A protein has these predicted regions:
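Active-site acidic-Proline motif in GNAT/NAT acetyltransferases
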Residues: 85-88, 245-247, 251, 279-280
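Phosphate-binding active sites in nucleotide-utilizing proteins
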Residues: 181-227
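Hydrophobic multi-pass inner-membrane translocation pores used for secretion
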Residues: 240-243, 249-276, 287-289, 293, ...
Length: 309
């Protein structure tokens, strides 16, 4: 019989257990189950309401879910991730048990919107989410392209490009980012503390954070990130965030910034470029397809509004 345990806080010993389970599942699936934001909050929770739920079957950990709140979200909401061992997926009710326990925790903590992310969703994921009261919100596609591209950036007239300077460009970047992503649930609504936390990450490199200026100021940006090679993937160069001020859209600046970011990554010797894009963003998908990107992975978000207990 499946037993669920609430882990609040998640202790170092708990984290060892979760990491071992996640690594075992990733070795079978060929992709992670928990995203970077989950691991970041597991390591350093931003709020004490973060909690893990561990599923135990006959004394063996077979599943784990994590719920947390973060100021990276606009409007503010809960996020959740889940990993379940392939041996018990879909048939034992582990997913539903984890989600129902997570919902109970959110309700006890005041309720709110919960967004669950599942990587490479299958039918049993859709069914489990629906049984736990979640509905499909959106799909996010991971796109990849071989590097180098063989294309140079074609900058609009009067545009100059240089790397981001921490402490100097923060406010200008936040202003353009929040205009460019005004309606985006993760990238919009950033504040200085959000940016500072990203710059404190070990992967942050201002040389790969390109800013494009015109006569009126900051017009757009391309922020890149390097992922070390893993057993499942080669070293990847990610377009972490690409944004153009709404007043400059349609000028060709977006394509030039993508090409410039990928060129920077190729110059570092990285052979594969990567980015994430919403599955219904047809304009962006056409742009990326024209540059040679193809879909490598699909991530799915499910949402549920939870009333306070």
């Amino acid at each position: 019989m499946i037993e669920t345990r609430l882990l609040q806080p998640v202790t170092p010993a708990d984290l060892v257990t979760v990491t071992r389970l996640h690594d075992d599942v990733e070795a079978v699936d060929g992709h992670p189950s928990l995203g970077e934001a989950v691991w970041r909050d597991l390591d350093q929770p931003l709020e004490p309401v973060s909690a893990g739920i561990l599923a135990i079957d006959d004394g063996r950990p077979v599943g784990f879910a994590y719920v947390y709140r973060s100021d990276s979200f606009s409007p503010a909401h809960w996020a959740a991730g889940m990993v379940v061992h392939p041996e018990v997926r879909g048939s034992t009710g582990v997913e539903v048990a984890l989600l129902e326990r997570a919902v109970e925790h959110v309700a006890a903590a005041g309720g709110g919107l919960v967004v669950l992310w599942v990587f490479e969703p299958e039918q049993h994921d859709d069914e489990a989410a629906a049984r736990a009261g979640f509905r499909h919100q959106r799909d996010l596609l991971q796109e990849r392209v071989p590097l180098p591209l063989g294309e140079e950036p074609a900058w609009p007239p009067g545009v100059e490009v240089r790397p981001f300077v921490p402490g100097q460009d923060d406010r200008a970047w936040l202003s353009v980012n929040n205009r460019a992503f005004a309606d985006h649930p993760e990238q919009g609504g950033w504040v200085e503390a959000t940016l500072e936390r990203r710059m404190a990450e070990p992967w942050f490199d201002p040389k790969g954070f390109l800013l494009a200026f015109d006569a009126d100021g900051l017009a757009g940006f391309c922020w890149t990130k390097v992922h070390p090679a893993t057993d499942a993937d080669p070293e990847l160069g990610e377009i972490f965030v690409i944004g153009v001020d709404p007043s400059r859209q349609g000028s060709g600046l977006g394509r030039a910034l993508v090409v410039a970011g990928l060129s920077h990554l190729a110059d570092r010797g990285i052979g594969t470029g990567m980015l994430f894009v919403d599955g219904d963003n047809e304009a962006a998908l056409r742009l990326y397809a024209s540059l040679g990107f193809t879909t490598h992975r699909r991530d799915r978000a499910y949402e549920r509004e939870v009333a306070p207990a």
